[in-house]
Amino acid sequence: MADKALHTPPPSTLRNNSYPGPPPATPKLPSRRALLEGGNRGNPTRPPPRPLKPREYDYDEDDEKENQGPGQEKPPAKEEEEEEEEEERPNWDLHHLLQKWGADIDKLKDKVCRDLDSYKQKLGIRL
């Protein structure tokens, strides 16, 4: 039995690794300062890259005329009317938005006044 113990290799060499001895130590965690400062990731003086803008394609409707049958073309007068409507629409949208904001501000003002009146009542302040 003593002969068998002398001929058995140490347990570290029985594993499937190419080096004898204990396994390597676990790597150390980065310091707290390195984690807070971002470590070595990129150059801290450069801002992150901006996202790409979506490409705007200019489609020419005239290119598609060969795919239209006779009588499907719009008369030029309608195109001019549509352009005029598009020019007037932003003014209408702006006017509508300003009216909505005005109504929202009035509602907020009324709510703040009601809240302040209720605080005065709770505190027993009467003027």
UniProtKB/Swiss-Prot annotation:
Keyword Phosphoprotein listed: yes
Keyword Phosphoprotein attached: yes
Acidic residues bias (residue ranges): 79-88
GO BP terms, alphabetized: symbiont-mediated arrest of host cell cycle during G2/M transition
Alphabetically ordered keywords of this record: Early protein, Host cytoplasm, Host G2/M cell cycle arrest by virus, Host nucleus, Host-virus interaction, Modulation of host cell cycle by virus, Phosphoprotein
Renumbered residue ranges of the record's region Disordered: 1-94
Annotated transmembrane regions: none
GO CC term, one of those recorded: host cell nucleus
Principal location listed in the UniProt entry: host cell
Subcellular location: Host cytoplasm; Host nucleus
Post-translational modification as stated in the protein's UniProt record: Phosphorylated by host ERK. The phosphorylation triggers a structural change that enhances keratin binding and protein stability.
Task performed by this protein: Contributes to multiple aspects of the viral life cycle including viral genome amplification, suppression of suprabasal cell differentiation and egress of newly formed virions. Induces host cell cycle arrest at the G2 phase by associating with and preventing the nuclear entry of host CDK1/cyclin B1 complexes. Inhibits cellular DNA replication by preventing loading of host replication licensing proteins MCM2 and MCM7 onto chromatin. Within the cytoplasm, associates with host kinase SRPK1, a splicing factor regulator, and inhibits its activity.
Summary of subunit composition and partner proteins: Assembles into oligomeric complexes. Interacts with host CDK1. Interacts with host SRPK1; this interaction may favor expression of late viral transcripts. Interacts with host cytokeratin components KRT8 and KRT18.
Miscellaneous comment as given in the Swiss-Prot or TrEMBL entry: The major E4 form is first synthesized as an E1^E4 fusion protein from spliced E1^E4 transcripts, such that the first few amino acids of the E4 protein are derived from the N terminus of E1.
Protein family according to the UniProt entry: Belongs to the papillomaviridae E4 protein family.
Protein name: Protein E4
Organism: Human papillomavirus 4
Gene, per the UniProt record: E4
